[in-house]
From Swiss-Prot:
Catalyzes the attachment of threonine to tRNA(Thr) in a two-step reaction: L-threonine is first activated by ATP to form Thr-AMP and then transferred to the acceptor end of tRNA(Thr). Also edits incorrectly charged L-seryl-tRNA(Thr). The gene is thrS. Its main location: cytoplasm. It comes from Cupriavidus taiwanensis (strain DSM 17343 / BCRC 17206 / CCUG 44338 / CIP 107171 / LMG 19424 / R1). This is Threonine--tRNA ligase. It is found in: Cytoplasm.
Length: 635
């Protein structure tokens, strides 16, 4: 007998091996029809998977996140099937699931056009309606290579040829189409009902710029039509809020080909940057951090000691001078350890919190660069806390509270926490990693927050806590991190004198709240659709005169506001007041002040708030109080 334990704790017994589909059928016809896959002892499998021993089983449907992933993975194969039906000469390569969808890369003799995409999507719908069964076959490697070579699929044959000879090869067949895949997949193509092809882009084979360029077709797929419609609506909103367009429209920044991945900040954009930096500097000072500055370029020997040269060199900009190799820093941490090491530290000095608005450079692939969101040169609100093991929980708890408070001030109320665990390529022993991961778990428990664990996503030197903020249109952005590092202090010889006069290694906590300033400012711009709150807006107030006779008074109002610390300017151009109001409204200025003869004579201003809200006429002092309240409350 085989005993199957279901998620509710109930057990079902079967006389012999049983498939996931058969278990679902034994529970009910409705569940059997809805089943897309199964989870056997935590492993995602096809509904045809045969269970041959006692196991825990969850039936996966389209109501589960895993179910939606299976739909998307299967839709990627449906896309490849349709392309092969319409364009037999096209060669298939890879087709993974990505956030909110999937893509598939093809080699074809000509570029796919928008008309091709429409035809492919139509063919996908036809194939889905045929409800062809999707079956898994197990092949040995050499036979699978021969199969794909006989089909003229050189890319697929190359992938399979790189797999160890003794490893089973899983192939999935639907109708006339067969593809390499680990699976799982839906039981039949009829389960795929809601999908849309989005765009075509270029992609190098195996991600290597030295290889041939392929065509990547992106698509999205969902369990329900209304989910897809909501997603497409969100994309429309995102298009309107694109920070690259806002940067140009609002004259904040630009990028150009001569400096790929580097930002040219214009005066107004730099005002926003400075507002954010000064705010963060104040928060860090209040939290007991000391601000430092470390060199941009350091010798290879330091990066070798830190492990960056071995583990991160492909992402570093390197140079040579006077027969010495140097690297531009991709991270600030080794420099901060040098400051810690400069002089003998005592346990009484700990925790030591060193903060730096550190400019870093990373050699990101040119194809991955994207406005402010993915750059090569960036500044981090970086800090490193050197502490004892006993201080980890208290320091992590304090950081967590600071991070949540900062996000709240910037208008982000929905924050999710994730714990990234050890990657395959890492420094340090398993024992060190066990200790580091459990240390962060203890800290999170002390903070009273819920978190999700992400195996394999940690940095090479330690596990990390990630803070994901949700913006106004529902997108999630990973910003802050807290990383526990037991490796770097040892590599770089950091130590302190303990209470018993012995030498000990400090624990090092790497932490950032905003992450990259550039990326965070991009997120802010898109979250607010460019209409930044008054405390962050580059121009908080514009004072406009109706006629030349009020110009002197308008200037005096601006000077008064500037003395109060506000970012104010005058528009004294000989233009119609309606033209001025419209122009500055499009620039999303929080407050527009209009002065005519009546306002001048009464020492007042006519106030318009953003969104064409007429607040009427008020004394300048009353407006100052209003703006002070907005800035202080971060409204």
């Amino acid at each position: 007998m085989i005993a199957i334990t279901l998620p509710d704790g109930s057990r079902r017994e079967f006389p012999g091996p049983v498939t996931v589909a058969e278990v679902a059928q034994s529970i009910g016809a409705g569940l059997a029809k809805a089943a897309l896959a199964g989870k056997v002892d935590g492993q995602l499998v096809d509904t045809s998977y045969k269970i041959e021993r006692d196991a825990e089983l969850a039936i996966v449907t389209d109501k589960d996140a895993d179910g939606v992933d299976v739909i998307r993975h299967s839709t990627a194969h449906l896309l490849a099937y349709a392309v092969k039906e319409l364009y037999p000469d096209a060669q298939v390569t890879i087709g993974p699931v990505i956030e909110n969808g999937f893509y598939y890369d093809f080699a074809y003799k000509r570029p796919f056009t928008p008309e091709d995409l429409a035809a492919i999507e139509k063919k996908m719908t036809e194939l889905a309606r045929k409800d062809e069964k999707v079956t898994r076959e197990v092949w040995n490697r050499d036979e699978a290579v021969a199969l794909f070579e006989s089909m003229g699929e050189k890319y697929k044959a190359e992938i399979i040829g790189s797999i160890p000879a003794d490893q089973e090869i899983g192939l999935y067949r639907e109708g006339n189409f067969v593809d390499l895949c680990r699976g799982p997949h839906v039981p039949s193509t009829g389960k795929l009902k809601v999908f849309k092809l989005m765009k075509v882009a270029g992609a190098y084979w195996r991600g290597d710029a030295n290889n041939e360029m392929l065509q990547r077709i992106y698509g999205t797929a969902w369990a329900k039509k209304e989910d897809q419609e909501a997603y497409l609506h969100m994309l429309e909103e995102a298009e309107k809020r694109d920070h690259r367009k806002l940067g140009k429209t609002l004259d904040l920044f630009h990028l150009q080909e001569e400096a790929p991945g580097m930002v040219f900040w214009h005066p107004k954009g730099w005002q926003v940057w400075q507002a954010v930096e000064q705010y963060m500097r104040g928060r860090l000072t209040d939290a007991g951090y000391d601000e430092v500055r470390t060199p941009q370029v350091m010798d290879r020997s330091l990066w070798e000691k830190s492990g960056h040269w071995q583990n991160y060199k492909e992402n570093m900009f390197v140079t040579e001078s006077e027969k010495r190799d140097y690297a531009i820093k991709p991270m600030n941490c080794p420099g901060h350890v040098q400051i810690f090491n400069h002089g003998l530290r005592s346990y009484r000095d700990l925790p030591l919190r060193l903060a730096e608005f550190g400019a870093c450079h990373r050699n990101e692939p040119s194809g991955a660069l994207h406005g402010l969101m993915r750059v090569r040169g960036f500044v981090q609100d970086d800090a490193h806390i050197f502490c004892t093991e006993e201080q980890i929980v208290a320091e992590a708890k304090a950081f967590n509270e600071l991070a949540f408070s900062v996000y709240d001030d910037f208008g982000f109320k929905d924050v999710k926490v994730k714990l990234s665990l050890r990657p395959d390529q890492r420094a340090g022993s398993d024992e060190i990693w066990d200790h580091a991961e459990e240390g962060l778990r203890l800290a999170l428990r002390a903070c009273g927050v819920e978190w999700e664990e992400l195996p394999g996503e940690g940095a090479f030197y330690g596990p990390k806590v990630e803070y994901h903020i949700k913006d106004a249109i529902g997108r999630s952005w990973q910003c802050g991190t807290l990383q526990l590092d037991l490796v770097l202090p040892e590599r770089l010889g950091a130590e302190y004198v303990s209470e018993d006069n012995s030498r000990k290694r400090p624990v090092m906590l790497h932490r950032a709240i905003l992450g990259s300033f550039e990326r965070f400012l991009g997120i802010l711009l898109e979250n607010h659709a460019g209409a930044l709150p008054a405390w962050l807006a580059p121009d908080q107030v514009v004072v406009m005169n109706i006629a030349d006779s009020q110009a002197e008074y308008a200037e005096s109002v601006v000077q008064l506001l500037q003395k109060q610390g506000f970012r104010a300017k005058a528009d004294l151009r000989n233009e119609k007041i309606t033209y001025k109001i419209r122009e500055h409204s499009l620039q999303k200025v929080p407050y527009l002040l209009v002065v005519g003869d009546k306002e001048r004579d009464a020492n007042q201003v006519a106030v318009r708030a953003r969104g064409n809200v007429d607040l009427g006429v008020m004394p300048v002092s009353a407006f100052v109080e209003r703006l002070q309240h907005d800035v202080a409350s971060k409204a």
